[in-house]
Amino acid sequence: MEQLWLEHDLSEEWIPQPQEQGSDNSSEPPTTSNVNNTQSTGRGSSGTSTEHGTFKKGRNDAPDVPQWKQVNAKNPVARDIFARLDLENMFEESSKQSPPSKSPTKNPSKKSSNNSSRRSSSSVGKLSNVSNMQSSPSKDPFVSQDYEKESISSSQFSKKYSEGSLKSQQSNTRSNSVHEKQNTDHASNASSSSSVVSSPSLKPNNTSPLKLFQGASDPFTREHLNQLTQDVKSNSFENGEKQFSLPEPRRPQKPMRTTERKASLNTKDLYQEVEEVMARLRGRMPNSGRESTIFLPRKLSGLREEEEQDEISVEVSQEDSSNAFPSLSDQLHLKSLQSMKRVTSIFNDNDDSFPSASSSPQRQAYMTDKMPLREIDVGSSQSSSKTARLNSSPKSTLKTSSVKTRRSHSAQSSRKVSDYPNMVVITPADLPEGIDTTQGSMEFDRIHNRWRRKGHDSDLGFDFETDEDASLSHPERTILFKAASTRHQANNDPNNLEKQQPHSFPLRKQNVAQSEFPKHSLRDNSENAPQILSSFHDLSLQNESFDEMFNGRYENGSPIPFISSGSGLKSKADKDAEYSFSVSRQSIIQILSDVEPYEPFWKRIIQLDISRRHLDSLIGLSELCPSIEELTLEGNEIAYLTGCPVTIRDLNAVENRLSSLTSFSNLLNLQYLDISYNQLEDLTGLSSLIHLRELKVDSNHLWSLDGIQHLDGLLKLSACNNRIKELSFTNSNLHRLEELLLGNNEIEEIEEISSLQNLMVLQLDNNKLTNLKASQPMIHLRILRISNNAIHQLEVDQFPHLRTLYMDLNRFNRPPDIRRLKRLVNFSFRTQDPEASNFVIQPSLDIRNLYLSNNTFVTLDCKHMFLGVRYLELANVQLKEVPKYIATSMPNLRVLDLSHNYISDIESLKPLQMIHRLYLVGNRIKKMRNLCDILANLKQLNVLDLRMNPLNFNIYPVIDDSIYELSAASKYQQSINQKGHHRKEDPQKQWQEKELAFSSTLSEAWRTRRKMYAEAILLACPHLEWLDGSDVSQSSRAAFTKSSN
């Protein structure tokens, strides 16, 4: 399908033809909307001529219009780049054209027409396309020799030229009329008087003339274009000749070089361009690796700078247009020269950068020697450009030519210019003076490119050393800070940690002699130090970490401006503390891994036991296990509870290193606290635990209970084994206290004990009490233990509802009247004053357990039946026979202890059918037969102890007091003669070891006698489980049972 010509395509594919000087349209400027060209060609079949070269928009009556392949007329870049080039079609068809009969004549054309056309096109900044390429004989190797022999004759060409001239005038007239009506087509005029005739090689079926420019897809370089233009000039017509022949078709003398084109198009460092773009996006300022056209950023300070900048940009564009694609060798050579210029400018600028106070010859020599060698690398354009950018100083407004601006970096501004027009970097120097750069108490320093507090003038030079420290540092190592022009000299000093770039810089490890630095700076205040420290987050050290550098090299002095070693940097103690925190956290993680290997469950742990793990800190536990409610820390070395989760309700910290300095203020949810066996001297640290319900502070160094007496929610308090001497509850707020354990102290007197109205358990064993009085009855008291004191008298009426009363080891002249205690169940009255007279005890009817051992003269009044008695202990009371009231008044007795008396006959025990345990240690039982008859009646007997009797005196070792005390029925649950809760060795184990050693010394006869004794007892008591301190095995009992049957 035939396509229509568009104005945009015609303006790009055709150029206006020159006209004669007498033409009517000679004064009209050329346009690009419509093009009117004249062509004189003849068809081979008919020989008639038609009007060609005049095209109008919307005309379909021109069958010979050349058809163009178009993809998008308005977007020349989107054309089919794979289509056959017009140049190839022209030369291919010209070789097949049938030439005229006459030989050609060479008539050069006038140079004025071509020159005028070229100047007209170049004035708008764009070269027009060349139309109607004339073909003339040439020595070009691309043109065949047959075409040279068959050229058009001059007479024949002259005739056709005259006809074409007439048709051109008619076409121009018609074109003007169409332009007046439709305003679409416009005649194309030129300054020359002659028109260019078409070549005989161009036929209607051919494609259009060569399109030299195709937008951004130009396949020819500027060098080829210049060569082609000069060829056209050389083949143009000479002045003064009115008849001329078709010029020879010229081609460039050199064919297109594929290698040259690739070099000119592929020498760009695309990888470096990508790095630069990404660096800009990250906020960094990398050095420019490309040496192409530089687009300078416009300043916003005034209209004059904008106009100058526009002129500079136009000049740069025009100059770069002559050589837009330099060769690879030229670019490398240009980079080398610019690198040398930058290095030279560095040393030239060093003389003017430092102030007079620091620009001595020694200072310059020192800075030159200390400059890193990598900055003087001439062959590397990247490092050279970086050095030039770091050591350049701000200059005045740029007013030189574009060539000097682009080529000379010594006079260039220190601002980083962009390689892309759409990526202009705006530096703080571009900000106008009118813009407010203050924010609160901070203001932006335009020179040093940082924020600072108001009132600090960074424009003025100042020294960071004080007068006192001036003698400690070397005069040549003085650190000055003037303005931006001195930055590059300070950066060359390897000991200076000042930032060399706005964002980051590499700090190289240098082997420099260590010198002293000032201890304090002029701005050594706590407000600036954290802000300055945050700016050093991107320091990169080689072969040495940042912490090692500051702990070792900069420990005694800091060369960093605004920072001293005591205020800004971390001290060694801080680093040690941080290290210890890390170790503690790792210990917690390791312990948690042992307890619960699956880490996601750590946050769900409610109960945690990490006893005896050698822990000394709990730092990190609250972050790892935030839901813990019950924590056991027994047997560790914890001194502080920092790191404990605030959700803890039950804390067991027994046997640690807690002291009065330990704070519990963060554990407000504590309800149950056990801090026994620690080093507390007072309880003031627990005053904030308002939710505390139970508190155990046993085995500490407490002197009083001050600090917790206002905790009205406290229910249980245990402060045994401390150093408490006086105790007063006068102003106490412990109204809800139910259990108070104060044993093993040095309490002499207790005031206002009756203020604890809800008290149910009172334990005052092993103290120095002489009296215990209550101002009012304590009706809720159930258990009272006052053993091992010096009490002479006790009014039991003050405690009417007592159920347990322990009064051992006191100095009572007379026993208390326990008949009034109707609810008394357990009564212990062991070991009273030996000077006391005969005691007569009248227990209540509901009594169950009576402990009356170790009293010289004690008598039990049993006029009534005591059906509730289950346990009776009458050891060491000098009994010669078993009392008869035991069998008659206490028929439900389960345990009877009559040890260490003078009993030889137990005949009165036959009625006790319910007895389970019988202790007769240390009596005078001799007859085996009578014993076996009585034991046979005790069907429920399980435990029997007959040691230290004449019956078995030589077959058992002697029983120690401690063994007897805990093995017999008269055992005392608590050691009376010793303070504290020190556990004794198991008496059962002691007896077994002693018995085994004694058995090894027995002769065979005594071993046989011992065996016969055991068999006889087991025959009498078949259900016996424990005999004389040893367990009876089931095999032995079965053997005895079998033998008895």
From Swiss-Prot:
GO MF annotations, alphabetized: signaling adaptor activity
GO terms, biological process: positive regulation of mitotic division septum assembly; regulation of mitotic cytokinesis; septation initiation signaling
Biased composition (Basic and acidic residues): 1-11
Ranges of residues in domain LRRCT: 1005-1043
Effect of S98A: No phosphorylation by cdk1
Biased composition (Low complexity): 40-52, 96-132, 152-165, 187-201
Modified-residue entries (Phosphoserine), positions: S360, S558
Effect in UniProt of substituting T1041I: In cdc11-123; no interaction with sid4; does not localize at the SPB
LRR repeat segments: 604-625, 627-646, 647-668, 669-690, 691-712, 713-734, 736-757, 758-779, 780-801, 802-822, 846-867, 868-889, 892-913, 914-935, 940-962
UniProt keyword Phosphoprotein present: yes
Role this protein plays: Essential for the onset of septum formation. Involved in the organization of astral microtubules during mitosis. Acts as a bridge between sid4 and the other SIN proteins mediating their association with the spindle pole body (SPB). The sid4-cdc11 complex organizes a signaling hub on the SPB which coordinates cell and nuclear division.
Official protein name in the record: Septation initiation network scaffold protein cdc11
Encoding gene per record: cdc11
